[in-house]
Amino acid sequence: MTQDVEMKDNNTPSQSIISSSTSTMQNLKEIAALIDTGSYTKEVRRIARAVRLTIGLRQKLTGSVLSSFLDFALVPGSEAHSRLSSFVPKGDEHDMEVDTASSATQAAPSKHLPAELEIYCYFIVLLFLIDQKKYNEAKACSSASIARLKNVNRRTIDVIASRLYFYYSLSYEQTGDLAEIRGTLLALHHSATLRHDELGQETLLNLLLRNYLHYNLYDQAEKLRSKAPRFEAHSNQQFCRYLFYLGKIRTIQLEYTDAKESLLQAARKAPIAALGFRIQCNKWAILVRLLLGEIPERSIFTQKGMEKALRPYFELTNAVRIGDLELFRTVQEKFLDTFAQDRTHNLIVRLRHNVIRTGLRNISISYSRISLPDVAKKLRLNSENPVADAESIVAKAIRDGAIDATIDHKNGCMVSKETGDIYSTNEPQTAFNSRIAFCLNMHNEAVRALRFPPNTHKEKESDEKRRERKQQEEELAKHMAEEDDDDF
């Protein structure tokens, strides 16, 4: 009895692996049937559902399952089957058991293979290779899939094609060869425009913007963005990426107000699961707000899952808020590698001027009269002639309206004027107006994002028309009954 129990325990892991793989294979067959039906009825929503279901199975894909699925979906010995099978690794003993178990229930492939199913096979193999971090094989597989896509012009493939474009760019980015495919992406975007493939245009435009920004080609990115056709967004994820890239371009072009709006909108619209993307949006939004002279709320830095990633930017914000130039230098040197990795170091260099302005504003509020050497000392200016630099900084701040003061050149001091009542100015009105405009824009976006049932725009049937219709139906039924009686 004991030996029997032990034998059952030993076989349990193997049986669980087989049952798990068999269920995954069964799910893939159902997805293939869904794609086949969508191809026949030309329903894009079925193809989109198949892609969503595949993402859910992503972690369960193995080499043996993929090999069995390729045998099921593609004609053995065909060009696509031979090419894709070369990318799938051969399994071990358990995998062979799974192959045998799945092949017992395997149906013979149809004689007519839909192009959607073939492209889907490319997609699922590419997804597996990227998850296994086999980027060189993924490059070859994605290049073959793009070559196959160029010969297919069907709108039911657009959903799968957009995913292939994304992973095509990702595989080249991971191997450091992103510049090689820029021409191909431009040609694909041109083809998608001619074919009215709006989802493909969205995806390819974002990939091209990412390609340009990866190599700091901001001018080329802006030229492409401004000339590319725009339309209503089809994918929320692609629209969020577009807003993020637009915010980065606007930031480099010193258009901080537009950049702030784009970055905050991207962070707000992004899915909750996209934590890394929301962190990147918040990093750039924090820097843009600092460059605008604003201090972000503390709650931004304490969002769930973001505390550690935003810690360097929290300390940077604290240095800017205090106006301590020495603390700003310390934070900049402490997190130099982090800022370089985030590619935000150039923006942080711009913040030095804001730190000085903030420190000078604090001095102006605290002192009605202070000598320029003391100003240089409090600002911690470590130049060869700090007094002359302090005088120049104060003069520029007065000219720009950052402080309300005058310079007494004879005595070498800064004289601050009395602080007026801010509520007697237009600043509160401007602040409230910006908040109201933000709420109205959010309401309008929420209304546009609503989904309404079909035929809601049609007028409802009136009572008179309803009575006429029912009367006609009754007369027709009575007439048909009389005809049946005549037959008897």
UniProtKB/Swiss-Prot annotation:
Disruption phenotype: Short pollen tube growth and failure to exit the style. The gene is RPN3A. InterPro entries: 26S_Psome_reg_C (IPR013586), CSN3 (IPR050756), PCI_dom (IPR000717), WH_DNA-bd_sf (IPR036390). It comes from Arabidopsis thaliana. Keywords: Proteasome. Belongs to the proteasome subunit S3 family. Residues 240-421 form the PCI domain. GO terms for biological process: regulation of protein catabolic process. SMART domains: PAM (SM00753), PINT (SM00088). SUPFAM superfamilies: Winged helix' DNA-binding domain. PANTHER family: 26S PROTEASOME NON-ATPASE REGULATORY SUBUNIT 3, 26S PROTEASOME NON-ATPASE REGULATORY SUBUNIT 3/COP9 SIGNALOSOME COMPLEX SUBUNIT 3. This is 26S proteasome non-ATPase regulatory subunit 3 homolog A. PROSITE patterns: PCI. The keyword Cell cycle does not apply. GO terms for molecular function: enzyme regulator activity. GO terms for cellular component: cytosol; nucleus; plasmodesma; proteasome complex. Component of the 19S regulatory particle (RP/PA700) lid subcomplex of the 26S proteasome. The 26S proteasome is composed of a core protease (CP), known as the 20S proteasome, capped at one or both ends by the 19S regulatory particle (RP/PA700). The RP/PA700 complex is composed of at least 17 different subunits in two subcomplexes, the base and the lid, which form the portions proximal and distal to the 20S proteolytic core, respectively. Interacts with UCH1 and UCH2. Ubiquitous with highest expression in flowers. Residues 456-481 have a biased composition (Basic and acidic residues).
